[in-house]
């Protein structure tokens, strides 16, 4: 046919058998990638420290998705929560990866079979003897089957009726585990952070899909609608399918970036808004205040703060700190976290407690400023010493640590105080191992950032694809210069324009 490279899909336009074949091959490629990627991640994943070196710090991308659906154990004898397991069963991480690879192989063989045996009776219109597809009927079948799968997932897998449940955690990402979830049928089901909404929405959407599928199987579209929406044209299917995909991609980009019950912070890392709003910092101070109210000492109160909670309150875990073109995991950036040094409390020579202003998300550098409880600047690390009034040396700032590895240790020499003031800009202070991975000290994004960027980008691309193919479908006659009621046989892609001498005409 002499088609240009970007017209490759035209060859399956009027060939239902091979259209099916290429879609099965596409499924084979997707499943094969998923299984292979899972095996690669399992080969490089270190499960030894789920608190300070969780999957999202290591740049794992497919392991979090398996985990949120209920997979927690490995055939290697480890569990994602840090324990050991003796009988992980078939549905371990490796089992899921293997299932995808086997499925990919079967799809590969099926694709070859359908490519070779393309001229099947099922694709033949008995009235004309030509290949054709009953697209409204196929739409009904797909809607019914996807509705069934959606309902089954919500009613059985998520609820634990037949399945493990899903990953559920507390608002601060400390106690997460896989557990069954009851559907939330009240208004709380619309809260994106309520796991019960996942069950109820899948049940409701699945029911709707089943009913809609049955409707489209039993009711034919009216002729005017059929013609108006070009329901006989396969490019209509392409256009509307692209619309469904880009819409879903925009939705999941939002739920990932802003956070939801479907994207737990234990699996994907915290969101940037939790840093911006001081979310974890407020909870830490609330716990410390509660401890002090129970007559605990500062040291005791801070020592009871979970290391996991303190680690979330560190800017290096903010997905918006990584540049778009900085490849690699968070561990390749600031290093592997080894331990929490403790919470630094700064005081001036008058005994006032000072607080270091934290670095906003989109700053790479930020002045070190210490303010008192009323927000008045009391000390800083000046850019020009000659004009300084509030330098650490002049104000006599000291630092004492509570909780963590440096619990009870205090420093008064200005060099050390300034060092910890700079580090306190970044949240809680951690010891980071940059030698093991040759980490360069430049922040990276978490899988939360990569997922969002990828899906938002492709959603935009697919949006234009929807417009393109939708317009081609609706205005095909205009673009081609062909009257839709013409009785000439026109093969799109084969002939450049009407009037081609090789165009066959139906016998009068």
Swiss-Prot record:
GO terms for molecular function: chlorophyll binding; electron transporter, transferring electrons within the cyclic electron transport pathway of photosynthesis activity. NCBIfam families: PS_II_CP47. It comes from the Eukaryota. The keyword Thylakoid applies. It comes from Ipomoea purpurea. It is a multi-pass membrane protein. Belongs to the PsbB/PsbC family. PsbB subfamily. Keywords: Chlorophyll, Chloroplast, Chromophore, Membrane, Photosynthesis, Photosystem II, Plastid, Thylakoid, Transmembrane, Transmembrane helix. PSII is composed of 1 copy each of membrane proteins PsbA, PsbB, PsbC, PsbD, PsbE, PsbF, PsbH, PsbI, PsbJ, PsbK, PsbL, PsbM, PsbT, PsbX, PsbY, PsbZ, Psb30/Ycf12, at least 3 peripheral proteins of the oxygen-evolving complex and a large number of cofactors. It forms dimeric complexes. InterPro entries: PS_antenna-like, PS_II_antenna-like_sf, PSII_PsbB. SUPFAM superfamilies: Photosystem II antenna protein-like. This is Photosystem II CP47 reaction center protein. It is found in: Plastid, Chloroplast thylakoid membrane.
